[in-house]
């Protein structure tokens, strides 16, 4: 149910992850978050890092903030997006050197960066029935939300995406394994929503990527919809669903950005309030797909590129928003990033100014539409050495 963004036009938020401060050099390494917070050094580093990430988003003028996915370890290529939950689930023992089909599907081989990234991932092996472990999403959200008065969006990988980083040696088929994962994640998301988290983002349903595969059928995609919606049953927060075309080590998985065309009708059947799409990387090529779409969902478009270290000019961001408004009403448009910033590839400064560009570009369009603008604290000339 739309709550936080219900009455907001052109609300702004990043996807989730953000580069760590260099001094935050601790990792959970599979430990319980609550147990780690009993260590004075970890508690101080973690809390200060989350505060720094939130402060940067507030200084940039974002309406909604995140904790930067600061629970994730110092790991290769954003590995913890998968492995923060996998390291804490019961039923997984050991690992293998490759993920199922991923390397061959994308033509990876030694000498390519994503080959090394995937080698570092070490997918787990399911030996017993999967069971819930100490994911502690509620505790993570509470620590972050008490550092800000702005609504804090908490994001986590979806169950079907988790399954892609597992070798199944227990279940009769992968579908049964996926449904068990969905039930585990549903319990976690319900607890998080019941604690008061206003926005829960469930990340990377496989529909748009699977739709590209040779032999992929509508029945396959319909099962993914059933599974994805199963993990959202009874979750009372505003639900965002994030989609993109990949972000391992801040790299493109597809050199030529694919289209959402086949996957979009299936994505629109997900039980969410806000659907995000990668848009900056393709210069909004898929926006005309929304011309004839009738939906109550809000659509969040990425207006800055996570795979590019060049900060987009505000006018460039504004132009993409104007293009989106040709197909999506302003009441249903949300402004975001293509994907997260915290996958080894971007510095904090670059990530910060991409946030600033996002908000300043949105402010240009807000002025044109007569909407209230957000204050971008860092853009106030009075606060700089050479200011007036």
Can you say where each PLM-predicted feature lies in the sequence?
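Domain-level signal for soluble alpha/beta catalytic cores
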Residues: 1-388
């Amino acid at each position: 149910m739309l709550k936080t963004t219900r009455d907001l036009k052109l609300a702004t938020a990043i996807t989730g992850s953000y580069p760590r401060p260099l001094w935050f050099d601790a990792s959970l390494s599979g430990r319980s978050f609550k147990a780690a917070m009993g260590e004075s050094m970890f508690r101080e580093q973690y809390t200060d890092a989350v505060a720094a990430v939130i402060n940067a988003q507030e200084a940039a003028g974002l309406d909604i903030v995140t904790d930067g996915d600061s629970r994730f370890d110092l790991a290769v290529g954003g590995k913890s997006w998968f492995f923060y939950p996998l390291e804490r689930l019961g039923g997984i023992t050991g690992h293998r050197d490759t993920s199922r089909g991923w390397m061959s599907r994308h033509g990876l081989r030694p000498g390519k960066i994503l080959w090394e990234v995937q080698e570092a991932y070490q997918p787990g092996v399911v030996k017993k029935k999967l069971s819930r472990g100490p994911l502690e999403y509620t505790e993570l959200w509470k620590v972050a939300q008490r550092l800000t008065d702005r609504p804090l969006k908490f994001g986590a990988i979806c169950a079907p995406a988790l399954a892609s980083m597992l070798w199944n040696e227990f279940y009769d088929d992968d579908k049964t394994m996926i449904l068990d994962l969905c039930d585990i994640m549903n319990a976690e998301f319900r607890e998080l929503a019941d604690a008061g988290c206003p926005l829960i983002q469930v990340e990377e349903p496989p529909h748009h990527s699977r739709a590209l595969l040779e032999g992929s059928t509508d029945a396959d995609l319909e099962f993914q919809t059933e599974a994805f919606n199963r993990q959202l049953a009874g979750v009372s927060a505003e639900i965002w669903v994030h989609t993109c075309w990949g972000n391992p080590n801040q790299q493109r998985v597809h050199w030529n950005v694919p289209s959402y065309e086949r996957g979009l009708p299936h994505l629109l059947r997900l039980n969410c309030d806000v659907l995000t799409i990668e848009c900056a990387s393709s210069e909004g090529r898929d926006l005309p797909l929304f011309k004839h779409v009738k939906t109550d969902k809000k659509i969040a478009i990425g207006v800055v590129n996570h795979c590019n270290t060049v900060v987009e000019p505000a006018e460039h961001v504004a132009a993409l928003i104007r293009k989106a408004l040709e197909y999506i009403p302003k009441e249903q448009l949300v402004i975001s990033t293509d994907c997260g910033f915290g996958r080894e590839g971007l510095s904090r400064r670059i990530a910060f100014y991409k946030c600033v560009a996002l908000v300043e570009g949105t402010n240009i369009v807000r002025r044109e539409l007569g909407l209230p603008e957000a204050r971008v604290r860092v853009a106030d000339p009075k606060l700089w050495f050479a200011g007036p």
